[in-house]
Swiss-Prot record:
This is Glycerophosphodiester phosphodiesterase GDPD3. GO terms for biological process: glycerol metabolic process; lipid metabolic process. It catalyses: a sn-glycero-3-phosphodiester + H2O = an alcohol + sn-glycerol 3-phosphate + H(+). SUPFAM superfamilies: PLC-like phosphodiesterases (SSF51695). One of its GO terms (molecular function) is glycerophosphodiester phosphodiesterase activity. It comes from Arabidopsis thaliana. The gene is GDPD3. Belongs to the glycerophosphoryl diester phosphodiesterase family. Pfam families: GDPD.
């Protein structure tokens, strides 16, 4: 099914993405017309330390990665946006950029660079390589950023101008977990991002998301055209800000801030499946992310549990699995309008209750993965 069926509800300026008029501050869930598939950082994130060559195939968060992902039946790409010192929104996941000069590894904060310096890292459009890129893992190891198919760094504007227009953007508002931001600083960063979005979005489906509770709250207050989702580890990691430490805290934040839904680490959903009911009862939409989303069986399980979409790295493999789900629905709905049929199935998934049989399945299957 084409993504265009989602476009009105996610990008219309006349109506909120949740289907309420702009002067109505009421929070409502997004109604996705199908199970939603999103490519993580395009065609998938890079894990330079991984023995799996698929994790080192195409440079993440690049135009090449976005456009390769667009060749598959996915609905959105997810990518990370930060703002340079001179106010330009750029697409890059890590807080720090690493390079090597005369055998010494040097780091620099992305938001402390101007645009020209940021774009000087990695391969260039003219074929040169001005500054080699390295990457630091969570455990402190540093790897040269080598992938099979490299591509230059890009800006948010580049993505709008060069990626297939029907492909939705899940724009993650990226902030440093270890930095305390004032509201004025957050607003300035978000305003720079909104300026580009408003100028170039046209009718492209767009979602904003962020792990930063106040950034999510503010972007919702600063605009009413695009849905905002709160990203949460759901307690898989613990932070000083308690709003980040459980699914129930995430639900509370969404309700208080008028957000449309949350994007949870899949492990948190599998560990506390009854939280899905609380999400639905709160009229919130639920998506998931995490490495377990590269396991087909986990995707099927979430579909049955009522999760409405997933962010994945293995775009090719998982898109085929999702296609099988949708084909099954279409067969069951023979003679019905496709869109109405899939919405009906979506509504049924929202009403799914966690049964004893499902708990038994989770207890047998999930511990092997977590």
């Amino acid at each position: 099914m084409a993504l265009e069926t989602m476009t009105l509800s996610l990008s219309s300026s006349a109506m909120l993405s949740s289907g309420v008029v702009e002067d109505d501050k009421k929070q409502e869930a997004i109604v996705f017309p199908k199970f939603v598939l999103m490519g993580h950082r395009g065609f998938g994130m890079n894990m330079l330390q991984s023995p799996d060559e698929k994790m080192k195939f195409i440079k993440e968060n690049s135009l090449l990665s976005f456009n390769v992902a667009a060749d598959f039946p996915i609905d959105f790409i997810e990518f990370d946006v930060q703002v340079t010192r001179d106010g330009c929104p750029v697409i890059f996941h890590d807080i720090f950029m690493f390079t090597q000069e005369q055998g010494v590894i040097i780091e620099k904060r992305v938001t402390e660079m101007d645009l020209h310096e940021f774009l000087s890292y990695g391969p260039q459009r003219d074929g040169t390589n001005v500054k080699p890129m390295w990457r630091k893992t969570k455990d402190g190891r540093i790897f040269e950023w080598k992938v099979e198919k490299d591509d230059p760094l890009c800006t948010l504007e580049d993505a709008f101008l060069n990626v297939k227009h029907s492909l939705g953007f899940n724009i993650e508002l990226k902030f440093d977990d270890n930095t305390v931001y004032g509201e004025g600083e957050l607003r300035q960063t978000l305003d720079n991002i909104l300026t580009v979005v408003n100028e170039h979005s046209k009718n492209r489906p767009i979602i904003f998301s962020s792990f930063h509770p106040d950034a999510a709250r503010l972007i919702r207050n600063m605009q009413r055209c695009y849905p905002v989702f709160f990203l949460t580890n759901g307690g898989c990691e613990i932070y000083k800000d308690v709003r980040r430490n459980s699914l129930d805290e995430a639900i509370k934040l969404c309700k208080e801030s008028g957000l449309q839904g949350l994007v949870s680490e899949v492990k948190a959903i599998l560990r506390t499946p009854n939280a899905i009911t609380r999400v639905k009862d709160s009229k919130l939409s639920l998506l998931s992310y995490g490495q377990l989303n590269n396991v087909v069986e986990v995707i099927y399980l979430q579909y049955l549990m009522g999760v409405e979409g997933v962010i994945v790295d293995m775009v090719k493999d998982i898109s085929e699995a999702i296609a099988n789900i949708e084909v099954t629905n279409e067969d069951d709905c023979e003679g019905e309008d496709e869109r109405k049929c899939l919405i009906r199935f979506g509504e049924e998934r929202k009403k799914v209750e966690i049964t004893k049989d499902m708990i038994t399945l989770l207890n047998k299957f999930v511990p092997k993965l977590l």
